[in-house]
Amino acid sequence: MGKVKVGINGFGRIGRLVTRAAFNSGKVDIVAINDPFIDLNYMVYMFQYDSTHGKFHGTVKAENGKLVINGNPITIFQERDPSKIKWGDAGAEYVVESTGVFTTMEKAGAHLQGGAKRVIISAPSADAPMFVMGVNHEKYDNSLKIVSNASCTTNCLAPLAKVIHDNFGIVEGLMTTVHAITATQKTVDGPSGKLWRDGRGALQNIIPASTGAAKAVGKVIPELNGKLTGMAFRVPTANVSVVDLTCRLEKAAKYDDIKKVVKQASEGPLKGILGYTEHQVVSSDLNSDTHSSTFDAGAGIALNDHFVKLISWYDNEFGYSNRVVDLMAHMASKE
């Protein structure tokens, strides 16, 4: 079949960057966007200008009630209820559910009522099967109508954990992600439901936070189920995060052995997903990087041959958005 036709629900950070990734890569066609809070002219502006990734290198305009990107007209909907979006009329076969609101099978399933064939949730899901490109995407089969692309942090951790586990065996591990701020945080102190710390000013604080990313690795690599957990520190940077995986190895390994297998994976089966660098990089050097995870060979340390701390960077917005596109292209190849 030709390129799969895609609708985007929620034109926020991920919705816009999945759209950019789709146009950059040419792997899927964006044919429709739904967002009840952003009108057409505002969409043009928000897509064109981006404080983090810079101006869109292409053309974008409003014409005849449609958003036209690089000459491609995109149908715009403004429905609040996902079951009322006429995806079928717009020709959208797959829908990226990127509002962050409809993350369960039941809620995301509403898109199927409007004619979509499949839904890809751009967030972890309580009950939808999760796929991480390069790790368990081969397990996808086309009986599945609703899937999750997991979280950006799981996409960073899982490829690294897979390589380490396949080569040396992970007995147990703890992950910390030093994570850039996201839209759910507050610019200054404000109220925040159950987790009071999450409501503190994002620009002023290092904020300890929870993340299900490490436990989720056990869902995509079943042999690691119950062997990994972790937490996050939200820090005052706009984008790019870093995973610190501290783990006990079954087989003895010198740090150079670890570097070698990660480098091999980055040039072989995980090319484009897992990167490898020996450069003295800092977070901003990874801005707009398309990898899920970039192993920092110079930053990790070994206490001994069985206990290591491994460091891997990720552009939590753009790397992830590119994997959403890759997952859809993979799913389309199975139709």
From Swiss-Prot:
Modified residues (Cysteine persulfide): C152
SMART domains: Gp_dh_N
Record's comment describing the protein's domains: The [IL]-x-C-x-x-[DE] motif is a proposed target motif for cysteine S-nitrosylation mediated by the iNOS-S100A8/A9 transnitrosylase complex.
Phosphotyrosine, modified sites: Y42
Gene Ontology cellular-component terms listed: cytoplasm; cytosol; GAIT complex; microtubule cytoskeleton; nucleus
Pfam families given in the database record: Gp_dh_C (PF02800), Gp_dh_N (PF00044)
Keywords from the named record: Acetylation, ADP-ribosylation, Apoptosis, Cytoplasm, Cytoskeleton, Glycolysis, Immunity, Innate immunity, Isopeptide bond, Methylation, NAD, Nucleus, Oxidoreductase, Phosphoprotein, S-nitrosylation, Transferase, Translation regulation, Ubl conjugation
Domain of life: Eukaryota
Residues binding NAD(+), per UniProt: R13, I14, D35, R80, S122, N316
Entry-linked SUPFAM superfamilies: Glyceraldehyde-3-phosphate dehydrogenase-like, C-terminal domain (SSF55347), NAD(P)-binding Rossmann-fold domains (SSF51735)
Family annotation (Gene3D superfamilies): Dihydrodipicolinate Reductase, domain 2 (3.30.360.10), NAD(P)-binding Rossmann-like Domain (3.40.50.720)
Modified residues (N6-acetyllysine): K61, K194, K219, K227, K254
EC number: 1.2.1.12, 2.6.99.-
Assembly description: Homotetramer. Interacts with TPPP; the interaction is direct. Interacts (when S-nitrosylated) with SIAH1; leading to nuclear translocation. Interacts with RILPL1/GOSPEL, leading to prevent the interaction between GAPDH and SIAH1 and prevent nuclear translocation. Interacts with CHP1; the interaction increases the binding of CHP1 with microtubules. Associates with microtubules. Interacts with EIF1AD, USP25, PRKCI and WARS1. Interacts with phosphorylated RPL13A; inhibited by oxidatively-modified low-densitity lipoprotein (LDL(ox)). Component of the GAIT complex.
Acetylation in keyword set: yes
Site residues (Activates thiol group during catalysis), renumbered to this chain: H179
Designated name of the protein: Glyceraldehyde-3-phosphate dehydrogenase
Modified residues (Phosphoserine): S122, S148, S151, S241, S312, S333
Chain positions with S-(2-succinyl)cysteine modification: C152, C247
Associated pathway: Carbohydrate degradation; glycolysis; pyruvate from D-glyceraldehyde 3-phosphate: step 1/5
Species for this entry: Pongo abelii
Subcellular location: Cytoplasm, Cytosol; Cytoplasm, Cytoskeleton; Nucleus
The keyword Mitochondrion is assigned to this record: no
PTM: ISGylated. S-nitrosylation of Cys-152 leads to interaction with SIAH1, followed by translocation to the nucleus S-nitrosylation of Cys-247 is induced by interferon-gamma and LDL(ox) implicating the iNOS-S100A8/9 transnitrosylase complex and seems to prevent interaction with phosphorylated RPL13A and to interfere with GAIT complex activity.
Modified residues (S-nitrosocysteine): C152, C247
Active site location: C152 (nucleophile)
